[in-house]
Amino acid sequence: MRHYEVMVILDPDLEERAVSPLIENFLSVVREGDGKVEKVDTWGRRRLAYEIKKKPEGIYSVIDLQAEPAVVKELDRQMNLNESVLRTKVLRPEVH
């Protein structure tokens, strides 16, 4: 398994209480693929550097996880299919 960091920017029109269940829904893909979710850090609403889909703000969430590459690819695919997700970025942090 490899370590990944996933950043998700969600639609700011989502209610605060809808953010956690949405993230958990995405994380079920990781858990079903025998991956481990190490940390979920929701930053809340932040101003975007530029508008995405005509939205000046987004709800940021950063997820640290360990999973196989195929599982992370499926997670990214699921996120991109969801209309509440403005942008995703999957990174493999450097080992120090």
From Swiss-Prot:
The keyword Nucleotide-binding does not apply. Transmembrane segments: none annotated. The keyword RNA-binding applies. GO terms for molecular function: small ribosomal subunit rRNA binding; structural constituent of ribosome. One of its GO terms (cellular component) is cytoplasm. It holds the Pfam family Ribosomal_S6. It comes from the Bacteria. Gene3D superfamilies: 3.30.70.60. Disulfide bonds: none annotated. One of its GO terms (biological process) is translation. Belongs to the bacterial ribosomal protein bS6 family. Binds together with bS18 to 16S ribosomal RNA. This is Small ribosomal subunit protein bS6.
